[in-house]
Amino acid sequence: MSETLADSELIKLTLPNGDVRAYPKGVTGSEVAASIGKRLAEDALAIKFGGKLKDLAFPIQQDGAIEIVTFDSDEGKALYWHSSSHLMAQAIEELFPGTKFGAGPSIETGFYYDVASEHRFSEADLREIEARMLEISNRDLQIQREELSREAAIEYFKTRREDPFKVEILEDTLKDTPVVSIYHQGEFSDLCSGPHFSSTSKLKAVRLTSISGSFWRGDASRQQMQRIYGVSFPSEKLLKKHFSQIEEAKKRDHRKLGSELELFMISPEVGSGLPMWLPKGAILRNELESFLKDEQRRRGYLPVVTPHIGNIELYKTSGHYPYYSDSQFPPLTFTDELGKEEQYLLKPMNCPHHHQIYSSKPRSYRDLPIRLTEFGTVYRYEQSGELNGLIRVRGFTQDDSHIYCRQDQLVDEICKAIDLTQFVFKTLGFAEVQTRLSLRDPENTSKYSGNNEVWVQAEQDLKDAADKMQLNYFIGLGEASFYGPKIDFIVRDAIGRKWQLGTVQVDYVMPERFDLTYVGSDGQKHRPVVIHRAPFGSLERFIGILIENFAGNFPVWLSPVQVMVLPITDDFRDYAHSVLQKLLDAGIRAEIDERGEKVGKKIRDAEIKKIPYMFVVGEKEMAAASVAVRRHKEGDKGTMPLQEAIRLLQTDISTKKIS
């Protein structure tokens, strides 16, 4: 940039690595990206300035932090897929004139567009639309944003575009928005807040995956539409990798493996979304619970147990009742012997119950911090279409802890909670963990409880702790809970998928609502601060993710059956049973395969069941009080004395070895 510009004509932009560069006022995101590097300029999709996503053409007028958004980030993928939905709509309009367009968002797995057309779309149509999308990409159409009044936009979509769905959005959803935006690419225009990538040429590879029925705005009484799904990428290589990952994910599906490995079941007689744990699954679940309980005990947590239901007034006080009312089971209504009506809820959250335990007796500043913990089951009435094995259920168990502390203890306690969460993920083999600092949406503060001063303090506390722990976090505006900001931990599994798991949250709101106090050194009452903390989150969901991450090949310490004893023939059954008993006496979970099958068949079946170790016993092993050791997926490990083999197993178990 020119060095002759006066200081008043320059702005300072801070890059993610901390570098500060001077640019002329009005510099665009594209120009900033180009000044950093040619490759970055090619990959750039948008910018993030002042915490908000903007088009590359956005003119920057003031100092601030800037980030160049590429497809590598979650925000970049969402933007890329949203832009791709616009390209799909343009292709459909060119191929099937008269089609009207509803909503076309990005979703976690790509994008879709709801369309209204007399034409019934087929698989062959999808291939034709794909080809037209790539042809539009080759046109290199510039994608341009136009801002105009809501009234002008209504007129535009009534007369020039003749799209009743966009008119309805403008007259209803955006009725209080004076200025709206339209994006143009060639002859196609769409109502959208953006941002979008700068040219249709950014689309390099696309696959339209399916068609389903939908209703306008999700209302079955409204017009039926066709929903066309797709996914797109900046290269054909990434597209192929994506579908390869999908095939691998099918093999790892926890619902499939959960049935094959006899871990859990869901019975329609019991109810949708209510999993039942079979013996092997219960062992896996109990091992995870014991692991965390033991670690928490070492770190000063106190166990509590609370009921599965609570008086509705409890959740009105906490604010959970109005906040979760759409996803709760209906209240249970009872009339007592005096004719008084009472209502109870299946517990949607453990927090209010723990607050009652805290306030059950006077607390002193010397008592704090108090760390209460519970594996507490909670209930949410999820829609049937959203249920998914263990990942999305109606009854689930949270590893819920609430830490009550003084303000001067807060940052250290947050750090300790972060350390525990990191320890859990490391032990379970999640090596790649991202952290998101989930803050309020500054544009919509009305949906959060508590005053501004409290929120500013809570967000600063979390930032201080995250910095102290040297977390490489990113900011998630609008991702906070209604009663406090939080740190969310996002893990990447064995096939590259991201999952949001553990949470650490600061809460100044609930102590006020429940009038929680402690007596300070000055003899006066003070409010404690509450930290909500759950490394697993939902235990059911965590196990579902764990099953898929390990593809059912659990580390020895978690495996429901750790050793299968395989006698070569019936002649060695007695010795096999003595081996089994010694394993059981040593605290090792073992079974014996006494079927009259050849040992090769027994080995194959144990491999299918994903049992970590197999001890094969025959005449030679019996004579030497030894076992022939086989490792799942690794094969023969040689013959060794039984006691040595037991010590090997015990070491794997005690060290919680992953592989």
From Swiss-Prot:
Zn(2+) binds at C351, H402, H532. Its EC number is 6.1.1.3. GO terms for biological process: threonyl-tRNA aminoacylation. It catalyses: tRNA(Thr) + L-threonine + ATP = L-threonyl-tRNA(Thr) + AMP + diphosphate + H(+). Pfam families: HGTP_anticodon, TGS, tRNA-synt_2b, tRNA_SAD. The keyword Translocase does not apply. Its cofactor is Zn(2+). GO terms for cellular component: cytoplasm. Catalyzes the attachment of threonine to tRNA(Thr) in a two-step reaction: L-threonine is first activated by ATP to form Thr-AMP and then transferred to the acceptor end of tRNA(Thr). Also edits incorrectly charged L-seryl-tRNA(Thr). NCBIfam families: thrS (TIGR00418). Belongs to the class-II aminoacyl-tRNA synthetase family. HAMAP family: Thr_tRNA_synth. This is Threonine--tRNA ligase. It comes from Chloroherpeton thalassium (strain ATCC 35110 / GB-78). The gene is thrS.
